[in-house]
């Protein structure tokens, strides 16, 4: 049953209303599905709002001024290495870091999103 829920989460990772857009790469779609499955729909929506504004879910998004990198714009990006050696380019590894970060710093993705809305960063 958990496997079916995970497959459905991956399929519907693009939004609560429908399947992933065709432009999404399978790896990004998997990262979104992983996040949704791990966090649940409500917390995923908050994480999605942050990731969309920070990087548009682009795992190679890089801020040349600050050095922030990836889906969640980790600063420094090397923070993500403890979640996998492929942290520079793998959105799943980046989402694992991002979910751990928002939980450790804000308690939840929705608390992080509320902070982002007030400050324009998290």
Residues covered by each model-derived region:
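N-terminal prepro-regions of secreted/extracellular proteins
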Residues: 1-26
């Amino acid at each position: 049953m958990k496997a079916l829920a995970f497959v459905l989460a991956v399929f519907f990772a693009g939004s609560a209303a429908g399947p992933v857009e065709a432009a999404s790469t399978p790896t990004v779609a998997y990262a979104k599905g992983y996040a949704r499955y791990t966090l649940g729909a409500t917390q995923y929506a908050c994480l999605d709002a942050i990731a969309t504004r920070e990087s548009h879910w682009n795992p190679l998004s890089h801020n040349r001024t600050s050095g922030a990198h990836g889906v969640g714009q980790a600063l420094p990006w090397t923070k993500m290495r403890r979640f996998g050696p492929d942290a520079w380019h793998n959105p799943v590894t980046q989402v694992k870091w991002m979910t751990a970060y928002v939980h450790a710093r804000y308690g939840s993705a929705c608390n992080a999103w509320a902070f982002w809305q007030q400050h324009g960063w998290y």
